[in-house]
Amino acid sequence: MTISEELFSRAQQHIPGGVNSPVRAFRGVGGAPVFFSKGEGAYLYDEDGKRYIDYVGSWGPMILGHAHPDVRQALERQLANGLGFGAPTRIEIDMAEKVCELVPSIEMVRMVNSGTEATMSAIRLARGFTGRDKIVKFEGCYHGHADSLLVKAGSGALTLGIPDSPGVPASVAEHTLTLTYNDAIMVREVFARHGDEIAAIIVEPVAGNMNCIPPEPGFLETLRAVCDEHGSLLIFDEVMTGFRVALGGAQQVYGVKPDLTTLGKVIGAGLPVGAFGGRRDVMSHIAPLGPVYQAGTLSGNPLAMACGLTMLNKISEPGFYDALAAKTEALAKGLQERAQAAGVPLTINQVGGMFGFFFSEEKKVSRFEQVTRCDLERFRKFYHGMLDKGVYLAPSAYEAGFVSAAHSDEDIQATLDAASSLFASM
């Protein structure tokens, strides 16, 4: 028995399912989860001392790699001055100014402690600003575990086969209209019927919680258009894509400007953090300026602000995203070529430093129903084979992968070599 297996057995005695977030339980791939003790650069080390090339990156935020020296120094400097004050600080202003500088659609921003808090608060704000109740979301998109957003959700909910959760009142769920991602016609039809009741559309501009699904041409533009036509707000959930697919997020890549944006992951450099921001007139409805209440004891905590600001300064350096995209493209193309050579049907999607692969006969995977038809058993075999060879991928066929600046050409090649030997045996 490995140390990870022993720890998992212990964990199940006092932690529900042995984990503090469901997808970590390996239900999507089988077996016991790996327990890690250290991260450094592009690598993770488990409790048995085995090293892995990491393509999870703490589910996205480790864009510089684990334990980057500059981030560690920023954390240590702030630790010397205190962990938190529950009061305003200079560094939260610096952070807000930097976010608004890098994401032009954000004129004002409010810091929170998680992506779920960010999306929950953005929805409340949209409802308060418009005076409407209904929201539109998309099947397979995950926006955290707030009640109104746990309807046909992606991520861990999809992995466990429970995209609708008990405990969500029908009276809450009835205000959530769930449509098909990348179906612009359906969006227009729903707005034709309910447009004057809809407060907002919330969407992952690149759907990263049913693996990695980019928007089809015209889809995001349609969302912008119908919101303008009906007085609804467009919310981009960029918790995953923000500062990950480009410096200005997916809205920069696709040239569509939302009214509100939610952020998380990268902006905390691995520490718990979230944010939501957007148009000044909308954000002015948040207390204490306006009547929509939102608060948090640890919001804007100086540890996360110090690390996040350091992270944003590093990724703002010239050429950072070109290099990151080139590495990710080399990995994606390499996987595709090796699978094809072995006769294994594989479809790859990639946007910037984010990628996803599907064991599927379909040449293009762009809809939720296509994702659910992929070969899960083949994914499980591939996953455990790569794990044995020292490559750590997301333990679910419905989660995206991430490349960091710390991944070297040698890391990419080692990953491709491991995949090639597995494809040959499949």
Curated annotation (Swiss-Prot):
Cofactors: pyridoxal 5'-phosphate
EC number(s) on file: 5.4.3.8
Modified residues (N6-(pyridoxal phosphate)lysine): 265
Any Gene Ontology biological process: protoporphyrinogen IX biosynthetic process
Enzyme class: isomerase
Coiled-coil stretches: none
Gene3D superfamilies, per the entry: Aspartate Aminotransferase, domain 1, Type I PLP-dependent aspartate aminotransferase-like (Major domain)
Pathway assigned to this chain's UniProt record: Porphyrin-containing compound metabolism; protoporphyrin-IX biosynthesis; 5-aminolevulinate from L-glutamyl-tRNA(Glu): step 2/2
Reaction equation(s) it catalyzes: (S)-4-amino-5-oxopentanoate = 5-aminolevulinate
Keywords assigned by UniProt, alphabetized: Cytoplasm, Isomerase, Porphyrin biosynthesis, Pyridoxal phosphate
Molecular function, one GO term: pyridoxal phosphate binding
Subcellular location(s) per record: Cytoplasm
CC terms in the record's Gene Ontology section: cytoplasm
Superkingdom of origin organism: Bacteria
Family note: Belongs to the class-III pyridoxal-phosphate-dependent aminotransferase family. HemL subfamily.
Complexes and interactors: Homodimer.
Annotated protein name in UniProt: Glutamate-1-semialdehyde 2,1-aminomutase
Organism of this sequence: Hahella chejuensis (strain KCTC 2396)
Source organism phylogeny: Bacteria, Pseudomonadati, Pseudomonadota, Gammaproteobacteria, Oceanospirillales
